Amino acid sequence: MKALTYHGPHHVQVENVPDPGVEQADDIILRITATAICGSDLHLYRGKIPQVKHGDIFGHEFMGEVVETGKDVKNLQKGDRVVIPFVIACGDCFFCRLQQYAACENTNAGKGAALNKKQIPAPAALFGYSHLYGGVPGGQAEYVRVPKGNVGPFKVPPLLSDDKALFLSDILPTAWQAAKNAQIQQGSSVAVYGAGPVGLLTIACARLLGAEQIFVVDHHPYRLHFAADRYGAIPINFDEDSDPAQSIIEQTAGHRGVDAVIDAVGFEAKGSTTETVLTNLKLEGSSGKALRQCIAAVRRGGIVSVPGVYAGFIHGFLFGDAFDKGLSFKMGQTHVHAWLGELLPLIEKGLLKPEEIVTHYMPFEEAARGYEIFEKREEECRKVILVPGAQSAEAAQKAVSGLVNAMPGGTI
């Protein structure tokens, strides 16, 4: 099969690799019909994450058709159309029973990213996200082996197009969990730092949950314009405003700040010189600019929700300010499985339209170019979907939009 493989920072290529096969009795093999490039993939692409090896297959946002099942798979059969959570969970351990699937104790043979973990078990394995998280081949490929086939795969209704369902794999549940963690309710005020795919969908979720005043902070004008035009967010460009938190506070009741802030940036994917040195030492770091801004912008007693990925040290983390303001922090990888039953009806009813953030539909063969476009924000790129078998951008979009490919094997 063809897969996108890693060969060093900024060097990925589509090449032929062995087809995956069933290894455990509850595995399934999936034919990929749509796969996406995630913002967190850029950390891997840029060489910012330790234990990424030459030949590794990226990709944790994917869906497709079941083509083979292990003998113990009970919930699926060949031909089923499913979307796959990026978190691999066993469904039966202490944490899975708490619906904290990202903390599953039984799927990750790696050590995770915690620097001071002691004897605490590693978190769940993640598809295509380094050997820290299990070294499980990802879904930027024509086929993929999916472990725990009775637990993770989520059946997609026949009339729901791939581009509407695909982001149930990661960024829509991530956005939803971030908004829920922020305890957004009718009339809330919230500031979202980062207008990438997760940030934009977080704004959509916040609006649906009743947020009245939403600020969005970024420095890409086209993203800010989209957030303002589509979701009614108040845009702040930090290239033009050196202190967005101050501007936010000045526009809130009593100059108290917003009820909640959501950091959809995480450690900066571009990386400063300091961050690069720390990466080489296997101690990833972040300047912490976004997080400091979040702490400054939120009101006393407010909530800081962090869906953005962090690892290692945070430089200049103003813990004293957080203590003084009595802030609550909620963060971590997304417990995808817990949210799917809640989110699917919202998509079916048109209350959430995750596909609207997509700007680029591309043939899978052009995946390396897709990474370049997404990384450099060329062509006003917000989100890239890659489609195996498509021969052109038009064919790729046709294959995953509307009712095309809504049933295995063809068009309705």
From Swiss-Prot:
Entry's EC annotation: 1.-.-.-
Disulfide bonding pattern of the chain: none
Cofactor(s) required, per the database record: Zn(2+)
UniProt: Zn(2+) 2 binding residues: C90, C93, C96, C104
GO molecular function: oxidoreductase activity; zinc ion binding
Cofactor detail note: Binds 2 Zn(2+) ions per subunit.
Similarity section: Belongs to the zinc-containing alcohol dehydrogenase family. Class-III subfamily.
Name listed for the protein in its UniProt record: Uncharacterized zinc-type alcohol dehydrogenase-like protein YbdR
